[in-house]
A protein has these predicted regions:
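Short, electropositive alpha-helical surface patch
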Residues: 139-152, 174-188, 241-259, 283-287, ...
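Conserved, mostly hydrophobic/aromatic
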Residues: 89, 109, 126, 164, ...
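Conserved glycine-rich "GG(E/T)P / GGGxP" loop and the immediately following alpha-helix
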Residues: 121-148, 152, 156, 167-175, ...
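Conserved strand-turn element in the central/C-terminal portion of the radical SAM core barrel
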Residues: 88, 92-99, 161-170, 196-207, ...
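A structural micro-motif
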Residues: 3, 26, 52, 159-160, ...
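Proteins enriched for Cys/Gly/acidic motifs involved in redox and nucleic-acid/cofactor modification
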Residues: 1-135, 145, 175, 180, ...
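Terminal RNA-binding accessory module
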Residues: 276-370
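Radical SAM/AdoMet-radical enzyme domain recognition
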Residues: 147-148, 152-161, 173-232
Length: 370
């Protein structure tokens, strides 16, 4: 009975007026006030009157700082470096709810990562609403972008792995890939958001590339890195997606051969261009198409993991797991393939090398330590 119900995030920006009518909600906090949440709650419990005001962040130019020094996962830390998006894909509400691109100052990010490293974390993951846009909002004289940020963080002692969140395919040029491949910490694990393998569908989505350009990006990564993991997102049942368009996407996915695919059924979002498009696809058709691609994803994922059998790899151990009654310590390779070793105390956050000898199940490979 003494708890406060707080509404925060994208839905607040999109439907704040509706939330204000909801008597179950005590506090409404806009996206650009999350950093003040503790203070807002403190004020609320003091006088039960103060509430976060929903602010228009559509034209906000400042990144909201929210520093974290300790994370529940004691091996991998997620570092958000950017917020907002300028892309305006036709199915997406994010530019309206998160505002335009706002990048954190590189010195602030470096300071946070140094603190993370001192706390014992060995791996960081750079994330953002549209990570590839990092730095586009800086003044020209700053000359900062995602690549310069990665190079800066690559120099920090204690950080052994730097993983990237979802990337816009167009950021992957030959120069970009070559520069990444030279770095000590970079993980050859790249999530390139696709959404569709059909050019006609991509055009309706307002994606700013075509299938051939996307494929070229994948080829560049595979030429510059040894057996990189390439993962993606795919939307099925986008308005107007015909059987032939879906078949074209399926053929494209087979040709690229991803490590993992996140398959989403298109969901109508009020306020987006796609919500009012004609030829909305029936739910049953979406489910059929989703099932087809999920089966393909499972097959391709198994095939990619199979390439690691008999190879020497390194895994960063993270947590204990039990498989068929036997306890193991599980972690990930730099490509984000799950590997495990027989359980021992004190292995968490340790890096071990060995050879993958067999699959323990569909997702985890057994590593025999050197």
């Amino acid at each position: 009975p003494s708890a406060a119900v707080v509404a925060v995030g994208c839905y607040v920006q999109a439907a704040g007026a509706e939330l204000k009518k909801d008597e179950a909600v005590d506090l409404i906090v806009g996206n650009n006030q999350k950093k003040d949440l503790v203070q807002i709650l403190d004020d609320y419990f003091t006088d039960h009157e103060n509430s976060g005001e929903i602010l228009d962040i559509g034209h906000s130019q400042e990144y909201e700082e929210l520093h974290i020094r300790r994370i529940a996962d004691h091996t991998r830390a997620f570092i958000k470096v950017q917020d907002g998006c300028n892309q305006f894909c036709s199915y997406c509400i994010i530019p309206y709810t998160r505002g335009r691109v706002r990048s954190r100052r590189p010195e602030d990010i470096e300071h946070e990562v140094r603190g993370i490293a001192e706390a014992g974390y060995k791996e960081i993951v750079l994330t953002g609403i549209h990570l590839s846009s990092y730095g586009v909002d800086f003044k020209d004289e700053q000359q900062e972008n995602l690549l310069t940020l990665i190079k800066r963080l690559d120099q920090i002692p204690g950080i052994e792995r730097l993983r990237l969140g979802s990337l816009e395919p167009r950021i992957v040029t030959r120069e970009f890939a070559k520069e990444l491949a030279r770095l000590r910490t970079i993980c050859p694990h790249f999530h390139l958001s696709l959404q569709s393998g059909c050019d006609a569908t991509l055009k309706r989505m307002n994606r700013r590339y075509n299938a051939a350009e996307y494929q070229a990006c994948c080829e560049i990564l595979r030429e510059e890195f040894d057996n990189p993991a390439i993962t993606t997102d795919v939307i099925v049942g986008f308005p107007g997606e015909t059987e032939e368009e879906f078949a074209e996407t399926e053929r494209f996915l087979k040709a690229i051969h991803f490590y993992e695919m996140h398959i989403f059924k298109y969901s109508r979002r009020a306020g987006t261009l796609a919500a009012d498009m004609p030829d909305q696809v029936p739910e049953g058709t979406k489910s059929v198409r989703s099932d087809i691609l999920l089966a393909l994803e499972k097959q391709q994922s198994l095939e990619y993991r199979g390439r690691f059998l008999g190879t020497e790899e390194e895994i960063l151990l993270e947590e204990p797991i039990e498989i068929d009654g036997t306890k193991y310590m599980m972690g990930h390779t730099r490509q984000y393939v799950k590997g495990a070793v027989p359980y021992e105390e004190g292995l968490k956050n340790k890096t071990v090398k060995g050879i993958f000898t067999k699959a323990l199940n569909e997702e985890v490979l057994l590593l025999e330590k050197e």
